[in-house]
């Protein structure tokens, strides 16, 4: 038997190889037929596939992908112990189960048998069965096999069955049945079986018990299933070719048993032995073999089957074919099914792996089924049998991977961020409102002192600096990261560029140590310099943005992720090297600002603005340094909420503080009394700084020469300036004066009050003068004739009835002289002043007028009071420079000049005070010795000619000056005073003798500046406008310094010749006149309107006064002749020219002295031609000169006028 078995195996091998050789040795003529046969069989097979793949409840691989159906069937149909064994693989569960027969897993979800055959662990057994079946087909279809009987070939069949178990270890049992007749007998005649028992193979001949195969049961389904499928209806075209041709035809089509598709698969089953299930799942593979009848018709001969142990075969529930395929319970939208190999024939051998962004709430077992121990009884409920629902939950937002519900991305505090963005929006709104408020109060002194355009620029830049907090509130993106750099750098350049340039302008203007005028940095020039700075920053940002866009093309992102100490990630704008460079640039720029703050630390300013700007710059430097340090060191570990709060704190500690430092003092200063800062404040408005000289030695008139300013503003300011100069002149005159007694009195407070209010003229003065005028109009003409002698040139000016009305209706806008650069306030500001202050001013001014006009006040009292009051207010002579504070109310000239501050008193107040005192003392002594006798005669002459001049000019002035608006205040000379039309020869004669007359005869006090003395030499100023002072007798010492820069040195000799003819009364006229003339003058002041005329010339630098004698004809620059010719042309314009002139002429002291001098009358006529006008003037015209006399009285006390 062993030899026969081995020979049978060798035959099987040769038969298998022979089939391949026969197929390869076919001739070409037969191959087309073979291809056609294969094509027809493929079509037949394709038509049969739908039926083969239809779900069949009797097989376990029916198509079903719902895992819930499997769980329900296992719970309802499968015995409890069998289901537990199927899930756990524990064979102890089967020992408790009783059985009467085999149990098959039929009707469960699965795939078709044709797809199940692809399992790799079953390929060996399937191939072995197929080869054995093909061998039997070949043997039975040969001619010789027909002649042999079954009994003769029994040994060969036994050897074939034995070889199947020896050739494939997975086969546990093999059997073969053989029938002599195909369908006549229901049971086979031969039934051979080989069983593997541990290490040996048991071969049995069960032919005697083969009759039980005739019954169709589950155990005999492998035989009856194949027998029922056989039908003898197959007819082939090669049936008439003989046995040889028929054999070739069968071999070409591989026979009926030569294909794996002909193998029948049984469902997995458990065998029942001795009333219990044997452990291990089995499957039966069976295939039929056929023979040929004598007429070459194939007939069914038998079935060969093998039982395969499935205990080592894995169930792949994740696969698309095979047993229980597609029965996993993983959710494919959030998880993925992964089979687990090596667990055997058990269910649940897979795991649901959550996809990216999902996690499972708990860690589950390897096969997703809790294996039960041997003592655990299967409950049979659906919950226990069914698999757990493997639902993967999504991770927190922003987490690509997670293991639990903990967030991997930083969770933002919504309420905190909402509060921050709300407050930031409020601050931005307030910043915008501040821009509107600043524009609304653009005419206020505090706003104009800093410059409206510059303040608006700072507020706009602050609005840009508020935007980084708004950008960081949103999720970082490439656009937002780029925009963050833009708003930060542009805002920084705008705000702190403007602040630094303002400090630079203060440094250039206030700390210039030269008397020469320097190019002044106006607001427009500062804006141009700021535009250069912003343009540089803009160009850098454009280049940086271009490089960032190029990096994006190279996959270099601008937005990255940071990680906190808690391993929480967050998105952030990455920091590159350019950020370090911009931080260094900001630091260096702020260092320059700190240097400027240190340089201008001693410069006095209005509202202390440089001081506040210095605090803002230092604060920005310190806070920004801390901010950049934290940002660069902790940026990758600082979560977005902290970064937002860092930007928020940095913004408000710098930007908000800067805005507060610049705006709060401006709006809060109006409520404080600025009297303490009278001598130290200096406005730095671009108009003020550009329209004032650098020092007092620069001509004050040159401050207005190149600006299209309002002449009224100029006159208002100059009137106050001349009043201050008068105070200093009187102080120097009484200093060390041997003619005055040294006597201390108790009226020092009166002097202080005079000095404090010396530049203030309240409305009460006008009302008081108007009341006195009504009472003393009857004798005003007689008093006026005595006064005209002192001021004959006043009659030639435009002084008349309009001055009287203007003085009554005028509201003096400046109540007090704040400092060097005081501003002229509007009528609205005046009306809102406190009543207590006006009452105090009224009392003070009444006391001032009484002190100046009273006969009982001795000269000694004047000396003491004025000396004490002057010393109580330091540096009061400093130029106010507020002439352009009202320039925004009126359109300015298109061309702006560049002028400087007059701060000479700040530099050398003590030195000049001593120098002026010495000169004034000498002047007073000489004038008093030379001018006592000829004084009455000179006064009579002056009275006559001043009356005639006033008669001619009064009607025109009355008509034209009433048309002026009465809002402006101040009694100032016009910038161009026309000669009287009644005396045209005077103009021509003045032009002809310009080079011949002696300066000493006209203005003797001006020669003091040309003589060597203790007065420090001061450089000459440039082209200027000579504006006449109110009274030459009262301010020769102060005016001499201004005019000394323009006097020719040849005037020294002529001055010495006529110097002795000056009388004391000409220098100090108030000492010789009584109280009555002063009272008359005070009564007439209210009748004299003081509307300042407008010199409407296009070029303000060409406006010169034509007064030659003691203020009426002041000294002219080298272009004096051309200016005089222009005056003659303007005289022909008649009333229009007279309308533009308003003057408070002074008493020509030089002319009086010339009348008393021994010089011929003709020389005096050349100097003062108006004194020799025809005397045929009507007597009624003498009364017209009284307003001029009253104006003289008003000019004697110029202090309270402002």
Swiss-Prot record:
Transmembrane residue ranges: 418-439, 452-474, 479-501, 526-547, 577-597, 612-633, 643-664
Pfam family, one: GPR158_179_EC
Biased composition (Polar residues): 944-958, 975-994, 1132-1144, 1151-1162
VCPWE motif 2, short sequence motif: residues: 1067-1071
Residue interval(s) of motif VCPWE motif 3: 1167-1171
Family in the record: Belongs to the G-protein coupled receptor 3 family.
Protein name (record): Metabotropic glycine receptor
């Amino acid at each position: 038997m062993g030899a026969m078995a081995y020979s049978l195996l060798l035959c099987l091998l040769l038969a298998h190889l022979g089939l391949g050789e026969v197929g390869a040795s076919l001739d070409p003529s037969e191959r087309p037929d073979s291809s056609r046969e294969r094509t027809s069989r493929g079509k037949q097979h394709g038509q049969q596939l739908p039926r083969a793949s239809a779900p069949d409840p009797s097989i376990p691989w029916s198509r079903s992908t719902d895992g819930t159906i499997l769980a329900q069937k296992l719970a309802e149909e499968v015995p409890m112990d069998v289901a537990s064994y199927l899930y756990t693989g524990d064979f102890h569960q089967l020992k408790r189960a009783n059985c009467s027969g085999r149990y098959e897993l039929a009707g469960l979800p699965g795939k078709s048998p044709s797809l199940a055959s692809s399992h790799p662990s079953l390929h060996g057994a399937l191939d072995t069965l197929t080869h054995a079946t093909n061998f039997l087909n070949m043997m039975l279809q040969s001619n010789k096999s027909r002649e042999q009987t079954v009994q003769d070939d029994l040994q060969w069949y036994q050897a074939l069955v034995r070889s199947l178990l020896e050739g494939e270890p997975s086969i546990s049992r093999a059997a073969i049945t053989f029938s002599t007749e195909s369908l006549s007998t229901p049971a086979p005649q031969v039934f051979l079986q080989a069983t593997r028992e541990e290490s040996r193979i048991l071969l049995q001949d069960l032919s005697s018990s083969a009759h039980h195969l005739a019954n169709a049961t589950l155990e005999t389904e492998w035989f009856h299933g194949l027998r029922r499928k056989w039908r003898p209806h197959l007819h082939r075209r090669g049936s008439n070719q003989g046995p040889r041709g028929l054999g070739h035809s069968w071999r070409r089509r591989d026979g009926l048993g030569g294909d794996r598709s002909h193998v029948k698969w049984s469902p997995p089953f458990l065998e029942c032995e001795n009333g219990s299930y044997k452990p291990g799942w089995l499957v039966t593979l069976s295939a039929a073999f056929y023979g040929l009848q004598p007429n070459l018709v194939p007939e069914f001969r038998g079935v060969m089957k093998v039982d395969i142990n499935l205990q080592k075969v894995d169930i792949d529930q994740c696969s698309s074919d095979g047993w229980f395929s597609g029965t996993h319970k993983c959710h494919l939208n959030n998880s993925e099914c992964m089979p687990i190999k090596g667990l055997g024939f058990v269910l649940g051998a897979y795991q649901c792996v959550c996809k990216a962004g999902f996690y499972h709430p708990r860690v589950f077992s390897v096969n997703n089924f809790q294996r039960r121990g041997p003592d655990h009884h299967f409950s049979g409920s659906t919950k226990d049998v069914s698999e757990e629902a493997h639902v993967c939950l999504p991770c927190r937002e922003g987490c690509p991977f997670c293991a639990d519900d903990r967030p991997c991305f930083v969770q933002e505090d919504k309420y905190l961020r909402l509060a921050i963005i709300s407050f930031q929006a409020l601050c931005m709104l307030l910043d915008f409102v501040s821009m509107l408020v600043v524009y609304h109060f653009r005419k206020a002194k505090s706003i104009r002192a800093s410059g409206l355009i510059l303040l608006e620029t700072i507020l706009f830049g602050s609005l840009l600096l508020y935007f980084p907090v708004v950008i960081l509130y949103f999720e970082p993106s490439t656009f937002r990261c780029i925009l963050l750099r833009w708003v930060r750098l542009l805002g920084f350049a705008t705000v702190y560029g403007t602040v630094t340039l303002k400090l630079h302008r203060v440094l250039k203007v206030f700390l210039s140590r030269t008397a020469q005028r320097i190019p002044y940095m106006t607001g427009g020039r500062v804006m141009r310099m700021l535009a250069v700075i912003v343009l540089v920053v803009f160009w850098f940002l454009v280049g940086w943005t271009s490089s960032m866009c190029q990096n994006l093309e190279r996959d270099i992102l601008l937005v990255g992720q940071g990680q906190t100490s808690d391993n929480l990630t967050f998105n952030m704008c990455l920091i590159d090297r350019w950020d370090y460079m911009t931080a260094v640039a900001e630091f260096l720029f702020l260092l320059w600002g700190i240097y400027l703050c240190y340089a201008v630390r001693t410069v006095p300013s209005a509202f202390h603005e440089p001081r506040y700007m210095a605090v803002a710059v230092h604060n920005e430097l310190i806070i920004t340094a801390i901010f950049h340090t934290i940002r660069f060191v902790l940026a990758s570990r600082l979560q977005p909420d902290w970064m937002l709060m860092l930007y928020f704190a940095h913004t408000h500690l710098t930007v908000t503080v800067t805005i507060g430092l610049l705006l709060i003092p401006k709006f809060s200063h109006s409520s404080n009394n600025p009297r303490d800062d009278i001598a130290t404040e200096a406005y730095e408005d671009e108009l003020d700084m550009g329209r004032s000289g650098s020092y007092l030695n620069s001509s004050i008139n040159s401050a207005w020469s190149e600006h299209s300013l309002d002449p009224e503003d100029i006159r208002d300011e100059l009137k106050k300036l001349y009043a201050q100069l008068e105070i200093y002149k009187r102080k120097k005159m009484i200093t060390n004066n041997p003619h005055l007694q040294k006597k201390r009195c108790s009226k020092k407070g009166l002097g202080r009050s005079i000095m404090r209010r010396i530049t203030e003229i309240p409305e009460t003065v006008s009302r008081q003068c108007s009341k006195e005028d009504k009472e003393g109009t009857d004798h005003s003409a007689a008093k006026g004739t005595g006064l005209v002698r002192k001021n004959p040139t006043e009659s030639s000016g435009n002084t008349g009835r309009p001055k009287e009305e203007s003085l009554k209706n005028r509201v003096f806008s400046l109540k007090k002289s704040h400092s060097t650069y005081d501003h002229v306030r509007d009528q609205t500001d005046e009306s809102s002043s406190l009543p207590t202050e006006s009452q105090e001013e009224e009392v003070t001014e009444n006391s001032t007028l009484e002190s100046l006009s009273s006969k009982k006040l001795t000269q000694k009292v004047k000396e003491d009071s004025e000396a004490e009051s002057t010393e109580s207010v330091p540096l009061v002579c400093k130029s106010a420079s507020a002439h352009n504070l009202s320039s925004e109310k009126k359109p300015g000239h298109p061309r702006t000049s560049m002028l400087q501050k007059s701060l000479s008193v700040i530099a050398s107040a003590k030195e000049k005070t001593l120098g002026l005192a010495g000169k004034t003392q000498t002047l007073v002594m000489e004038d008093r010795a030379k001018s006592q006798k000829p004084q009455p005669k000179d006064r009579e002459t002056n009275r006559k000619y001043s009356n005639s001049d006033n008669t001619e000019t009064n009607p025109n002035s009355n008509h034209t000056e009433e048309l002026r608006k009465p809002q402006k205040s101040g009694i100032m000379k016009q910038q161009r005073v026309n000669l009287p039309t009644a005396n045209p020869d005077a103009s021509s004669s003045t032009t002809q003798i310009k080079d011949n007359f002696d300066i000493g005869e006209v203005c003797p006090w001006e020669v003091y500046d040309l003589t060597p003395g203790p007065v420090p030499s001061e450089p000459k100023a440039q082209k200027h406008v000579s504006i006449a002072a109110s009274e030459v007798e009262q301010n020769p010492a102060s005016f001499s310094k201004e005019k000394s820069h323009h006097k020719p040195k040849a005037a020294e000799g002529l001055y010495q010749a006529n110097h002795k003819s000056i009388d004391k009364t000409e220098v100090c006229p108030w000492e010789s006149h009584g109280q009555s003339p002063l009272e008359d003058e005070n009564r007439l002041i209210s009748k004299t309107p003081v509307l300042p005329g407008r010199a409407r010339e296009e070029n303000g630098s060409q406006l010169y006064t034509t007064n030659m004698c003691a203020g009426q004809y002041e000294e002219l620059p080298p272009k004096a002749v051309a200016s005089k010719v222009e005056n003659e042309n303007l005289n022909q314009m008649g009333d229009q020219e007279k309308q533009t002139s308003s003057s408070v002429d002074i008493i020509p002291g030089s002319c009086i002295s010339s009348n008393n001098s021994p010089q011929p009358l003709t020389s005096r006529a050349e100097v003062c031609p108006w004194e020799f006008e025809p005397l045929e003037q009507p007597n009624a015209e003498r009364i017209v000169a009284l307003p001029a006399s009253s104006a003289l009285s008003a000019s004697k006390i110029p202090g309270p006028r402002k």
